[in-house]
């Protein structure tokens, strides 16, 4: 039979499928447990008020009549009264009226958490509040828009940004072959007899003025220079490009090396010793970034904090942005295998 509800209370129906049940068994086992449950958690956890509640047991095929009786809950939480027996043919109905004597003085405004011992399922106040901070900017659902945002964040920390090709795509995507970082060597570059002109080379745009390009007040640690150069450009991040006439070599049996194709983006990771930098192996010193007098690129910041140049990062950057022309994919794979031997 279904569970029925009464005003400000709950009716619980118990059905026996196997014939008559002794009332003393039900009283000792069932009523004891159910009255305790009703006393503590009626109507989905709401505290018991001062009114009475009833529960109903239905026993199928019960032929013996039960006299009206009172049952005192051993827990002392309330009285159980067998009020009546109703017969509807195949089943008899026994109504038990439960009146809670202990909780009459409870304040109706008391929180339900007082009676529940599982804090993980019933959190109160700030403990039950989960805050997701998405920031003040709206994130677009367009995948291209998300990619553009990520590209802007990455580009903001690169020394020279991301070069783009004629269609506006990032050069790192156009030339996105997997990089196999090994020890630094001058890898062979497949020679091309095609003339090189000002414009786009492998997706990188440049102009003739970049031959003498330098960042004023930036990156004092990068390129390996002579003492005169260091005196004259102590705090210049200098990028020197091989002129196009120098990068074009006549046909010969020995292919040119990659150093002939370095452009102004190329970074030397052989940093000069700096007394201000921390010894290698010591804990990072981020205060170096606060006391510096000059703007630093990402690699120099790493060097100042950790005391050594990020060689693998610089190799990756040079591989993608430090050359006017790069080897073909097949040649690159061959050179990678050579350097891994």
UniProtKB/Swiss-Prot annotation:
Biased composition (Polar residues): 250-260
Region (Disordered): 211-264
A GO BP entry: cell division
InterPro entries from the UniProt entry: IBD2
One Gene Ontology cellular component annotation held by this UniProt entry: cytoplasm
Subcellular location: Cytoplasm, Cytoskeleton, Spindle pole
Keywords attached to this entry: Cell cycle, Cell division, Cytoplasm, Cytoskeleton, Mitosis
Presence of the UniProt keyword Translocase in the record: no
Entry similarity comment: Belongs to the IBD2 family.
Role played: Part of a checkpoint which monitors spindle integrity and prevents premature exit from mitosis.
Protein name (record): Protein IBD2
Organism of derivation: Vanderwaltozyma polyspora (strain ATCC 22028 / DSM 70294 / BCRC 21397 / CBS 2163 / NBRC 10782 / NRRL Y-8283 / UCD 57-17) (Kluyveromyces polysporus)
Phylogenetic lineage: Eukaryota, Fungi, Dikarya, Ascomycota, Saccharomycotina
């Amino acid at each position: 039979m279904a569970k029925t509800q009464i005003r400000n209370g709950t009716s619980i129906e118990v059905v026996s499928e196997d014939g008559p049940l002794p009332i003393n068994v039900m009283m000792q086992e069932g009523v004891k447990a159910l009255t305790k449950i009703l006393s503590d958690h009626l109507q989905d956890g709401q505290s018991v008020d001062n009114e009475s509640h009833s529960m109903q047991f239905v026993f199928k095929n019960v032929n013996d009549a039960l006299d009206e009786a009172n049952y005192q809950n051993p827990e002392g939480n309330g009285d159980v009264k067998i009020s009546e027996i109703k017969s509807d043919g195949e089943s008899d109905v026994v109504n038990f009226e439960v009146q809670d004597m202990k909780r009459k003085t409870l304040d109706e405004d008391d929180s339900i958490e007082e009676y529940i011992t599982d804090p993980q399922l019933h959190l109160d106040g700030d403990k039950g509040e989960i805050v997701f901070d998405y920031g003040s900017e709206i994130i677009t659902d367009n995948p291209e828009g998300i990619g553009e945002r990520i590209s802007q964040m990455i580009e903001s920390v690169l020394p020279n940004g991301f070069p783009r090709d004629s269609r506006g795509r990032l050069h790192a995507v156009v030339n996105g072959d997997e990089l196999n970082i090994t020890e630094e060597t001058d890898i062979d570059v497949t020679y091309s007899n095609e003339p090189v002109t000002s414009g786009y080379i492998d997706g990188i745009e440049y102009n003739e003025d970049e031959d003498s390009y330098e960042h004023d007040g930036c990156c004092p640690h990068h390129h390996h220079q002579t003492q005169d150069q260091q005196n004259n450009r102590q705090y210049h991040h200098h990028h020197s490009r091989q002129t196009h006439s120098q990068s074009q070599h006549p046909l010969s049996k020995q292919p040119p090396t990659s150093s002939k194709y370095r452009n102004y983006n190329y970074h030397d990771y052989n940093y000069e010793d700096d007394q201000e930098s921390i010894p290698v192996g010591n804990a990072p010193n981020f205060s170096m970034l606060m006391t510096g007098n000059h703007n630093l690129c990402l690699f120099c910041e790493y060097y100042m904090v950790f005391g050594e140049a990020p060689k693998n990062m610089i190799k990756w950057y040079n591989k993608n942005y430090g050359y006017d022309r790069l080897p073909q994919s097949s040649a690159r794979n061959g050179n990678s295998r050579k350097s891994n031997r």
